[in-house]
Amino acid sequence: MKIAFNTLGCKLNYAETATYERGLMAAGWEVVPWTDVADVYLINTCAVTETAEKKSRNLIRRAHKTAPEARIVVTGCYAELRKEQLLALDGVWRVFGANEKSQIVNTLCHAERSEASVVTFGAYSSGEERTRAFLKVQDGCDNFCAYCTVPYARGRSRNIPICEVVKMARDIAAEGVKEVVLTGVNTGDFGRTSGESFLDLLKALNQVEGIERYRISSIEPNLITPEIVDWIASGTKFQRHFHIPLQSGSDRLLKRVGRRYDTALFASRIDYIRQAMERPGEPRVFFGIDVIVGLPGETEELFQETYTFLKERIRPAFIHVFPYSRRPGTRAAEWKDQVQDRIKTERVARLEALCEELHTAFVQAHKGLHETVLWESSQKEGRMGGYTGNYIRVERPFDAARVNQLEEIVL
């Protein structure tokens, strides 16, 4: 049987897709490009924005047009929130919600074609390419921020025990993968269901032989404790790379939407990490910051607070900018002071320009410094790429002998 995959949204979705891919390949399935004719198309959807939902529907229609007789399987956040809507689309065979994903591989391997139905989930490890793998350690969220559908789509915060995560990491290491990215909806909340701590997890993973690098895909600022920072800074496999959601640099907006920190706490966490991990003449910490533009009630003055906070106080290496999308069923969707789309677009452009300025400055500051690169297997126009420990992208002429190798270079 041939299967094609397409994934939208966050790294957690990509982690889960890679798990389905591994399971089906182990069962003898052939994975083909999305544009090929396949027996099954699996689409891992996103529902963070209206645009993401539209892209998911378009992918379903495209797959059905490419292979009208194929089975189309839909999972992800959109699948949890809009099951009946998806089942009504031509070609959709099954829809797997948030608590149903553990059945995907088994269902595809054993089920006969039948009427479309909603079937029900666990937690996984996963990987991509030959050099890097995503390892899912947590799922769900208990925060219920006013703008967000994720708690409804993925359920309450939960995790598997450390011993099971370590086993998956060892399996990944056995495949020769050298870098692992820890993923989750609220990764730092790990331990809620197992009575363990996120720091205990990091320490256990650090002992897995064969894995040379770890990254934490995203962690809430209030969950980055001094103990975690001090331990990472003490000389571990965890890299100087943090992806942290800010969402707004306005305390008024942070409080209104229900975030569990203010700008003072956020800045203090950034300061602590820098003080613990940065030294003169050494590579700096890469901070990737998430920001939502155009939250209800965001006046020009409040947007300027965000802009100034990022430019003058935080100065991250990268800003992930998202225009606010009004999601049905959330509190923020009912608020009357919605921001016009044209204003959101203009503010997104301003933050993207700031991102370009800050990222360029971050890279330039590393010229002449020594860093270690993990070279990737993909190539384009005779060149290969890789990332330094602090996530600077570098390239060189392709050399097959360097694939999946760590090499010290001068930037």
Predicted regions and their residues:
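Conserved SAM/AdoMet-binding glycine-rich loop
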Residues: 72-73, 81-82, 174-301
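Glycine-centered loop/turn positions within well-structured domains
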Residues: 102, 143, 188, 222, ...
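Short acidic, glycine/proline-rich loop/turn micro-motifs
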Residues: 254-257, 331-335
